[in-house]
Each structure stands twice: as structure tokens, then as C-alpha cells.
């Protein structure tokens, strides 16, 4: 454990951020899986699911959860075929 007061605060803040990022990543993974399943099964609402997943990936990039290349790769995978 940290000895400095500001570092003790940072430990708590980092833990909150870690949990929030973990939840957001899980939400994105679920959206991507749903979109890819909809594309392979040729569902009627596949465009809506793909748009939602791409939107979440963009938000993750904006928040700094994803790096540029990963976001581009995921978006490309969602948009292809």
C-alpha cells in the first residue's frame, strides 16, 4: 500500500476506473458478438446492431480504452461482408 496520501487516493481512483473500463469492454464485446451473429444469420436488424457496436467502439477509442489500431480493426471486422 502507498505511504503518500495522494497515492492512496490514486489507488482508489484507479480501481474505480478499472472496474468501469472492465464493464464497458464487456458491453462492447457483447455488442460485437451480437452484431457478428446477426450478420452470419442474416437477421433483419443487423444494420442496427452493427451501427450500435461501431458506436460503442468509437466511444471506447474516445475514452482511451482502446488504441487506434484495435478500434480500426474491430470496426473493419464489423463492416466487412
Swiss-Prot record:
Task performed by this protein: Binds directly to 16S ribosomal RNA.
Query: Which residues belong to the signal peptide in this entry?
Result: none
Species this chain originates from:
Mycoplasma mycoides subsp. mycoides SC (strain CCUG 32753 / NCTC 10114 / PG1)
UniProt GO MF annotations:
small ribosomal subunit rRNA binding; structural constituent of ribosome
Q: What keywords are assigned to this protein?
A: Ribonucleoprotein, Ribosomal protein, RNA-binding, rRNA-binding
Tree of life domain: Bacteria
- Entry annotated with the keyword rRNA-binding: yes
* Protein family (similarity comment): Belongs to the bacterial ribosomal protein bS20 family.
Quote the Pfam families the UniProt record gives: Ribosomal_S20p (PF01649)
Q: What is this protein called?
A: Small ribosomal subunit protein bS20
